[in-house]
Amino acid sequence: KNEALEFSLQAGEKIGFVFPIYSWAPPEIVLNFIRQLSLKGYKRQYLFFVCSCGDDTGLTQQVLEKALSHKGWKCHAGFSVTMPNNYVLLPGFDVDNKELEEKKLADAVSTVSKINASISKREELFLCHEGSMPFIKTRIINPLFNRFQMSPKHFYATDACIGCKRCEESCPVENVTVVDGRPVWGMDCTSCPVSYTHLTLPTILRV
């Protein structure tokens, strides 16, 4: 939403941003949220971020720290949690096999526990798995992704659609509306796979 947001902070309060990685960077919706956010009573309180990724984060830490510094805020810590891949909207991308999926989920439990401990202690550290070629992924591929993939124009519903409205209810930006039993996409799309992954049958596809 394009509107100002204000939060009042207490002296010892922690500030946290939790988000998924989109093409090796924070989603534009998260960066826009930071631009619109006002923290009343900010006095360098402990600020951290936790991001989830399928494999690696690229230069997410750099991108987020720059966005926060533009607001006059210092980022004290950042962490990544590797989760099962769920991006299936481009050729060559698919979900992980069952064995890898279960391993990632099991490892994530331990990772989150360690992150919680670090945040509780207000530790100042960054544990983000950048992966290989982070500059290319974040500085070259990500802008192309934001320019050409952040669109709903290729989505369509198959004949298996029963008008259950799960896509409408799960859309994080309220961009999907079910009309006459069929989903209709607006233009405020973040190109996330939530509508696809929330369905029990593959009724929403992308060409």
Predicted regions and their residues:
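FMN-binding flavodoxin-like domain, especially the glycine-rich phosphate-binding loop
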Residues: K1, E6-F19, S23-L144
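Intrinsically disordered, low-complexity regions enriched in small/polar residues
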Residues: W24, A157-T158, T197
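Ferredoxin-like iron-sulfur electron-transfer modules
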Residues: I140-C192
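Conserved small/polar residues in nucleotide/adenosyl-binding loops
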Residues: T197-T203
